[in-house]
């Protein structure tokens, strides 16, 4: 789960502003505070260092559980992964042992976009299962894209009978499956804002207010897609003979 400190610059995607936070304190305490703070940041005529930092009243934004919105598995396609040719230049049939090797990449790429300016600089994990049964777990950052691939290979030996003055192609083949996963990750905000008053309010100069009281909303969404391609059911196929 990703976690980082909230800043005043985050307030816009929470449908809030320093003015609206200040007004929330005014409505609650009947007096407008001189300044407000969140974590180590201050606004207006706030006490420094920030009282939220001094007294340990921190405010965080956190990523929640990944929600898989949709999964689309495309029609499988045949893929030739490698080939080898057996040749017979003689005048009678011959049985040859042919080695064939195949290589391919299982690839995964992803991209993310933030709803209404949601920001999250730290990486967070997105995990789940593809329809093919494979598990995925990628580290993503809001508004960025990336990719990874794993190279795989296979070798096989097979006996092939080749007619006179002919050639036979042996292919290593597989079934390519591609899938697109669309996901959403909720971003929630929790913690406190602080306010300092020029004169005592209910016996105190400093007051703190939770995010659900100070902000218009306390959540946002990061959306993204994961594209995955992999090869299944690898086997060898012997093609028809052809004249040399």
Swiss-Prot record:
<comment type="similarity">
    <text>Belongs to the hydralysin family.</text>
</comment>
<protein>
    <recommendedName>
        <fullName>Hydralysin</fullName>
    </recommendedName>
</protein>
<dbReference type="GO" id="GO:0005576">
    <property type="term" value="C:extracellular region"/>
</dbReference>
<dbReference type="GO" id="GO:0090729">
    <property type="term" value="F:toxin activity"/>
</dbReference>
<keyword id="KW-0964">Secreted</keyword>
<keyword id="KW-0800">Toxin</keyword>
């Amino acid at each position: 789960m990703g976690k980082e400190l909230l800043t005043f610059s985050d307030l816009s995607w929470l449908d809030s502003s320093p003015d609206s936070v200040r007004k929330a304190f005014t409505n609650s305490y009947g007096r407008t505070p001189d300044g407000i703070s969140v974590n180590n940041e201050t606004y207006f005529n706030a006490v420094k260092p920030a009282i939220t930092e001094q007294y340990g009243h921190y405010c965080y934004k956190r990523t929640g559980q990944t929600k898989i919105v949709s999964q689309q598995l495309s029609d499988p396609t045949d893929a030739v992964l490698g080939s080898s040719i057996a040749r017979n230049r003689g005048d009678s049939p011959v049985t040859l042992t042919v080695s064939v090797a195949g290589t391919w990449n299982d690839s995964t790429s992803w991209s993310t976009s933030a709803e209404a300016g949601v920001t999250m600089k730290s990486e967070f994990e997105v995990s789940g299962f593809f329809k093919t049964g494979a598990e995925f777990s990628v580290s993503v950052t809001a508004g960025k894209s990336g990719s990874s691939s794993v190279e795989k290979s296979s070798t096989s030996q097979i006996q092939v009978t080749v007619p006179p003055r002919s050639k036979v192609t042996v292919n290593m083949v597989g079934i390519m499956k591609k899938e697109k996963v669309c996901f959403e990750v909720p971003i929630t905000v929790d913690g406190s804002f602080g306010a300092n008053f020029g004169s005592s309010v209910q016996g105190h100069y400093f007051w703190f207010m939770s995010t659900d009281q100070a902000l218009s909303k306390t959540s946002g969404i990061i959306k993204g897609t994961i594209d995955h391609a992999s090869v299944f059911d690898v086997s060898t196929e012997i093609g028809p003979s052809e004249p040399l």
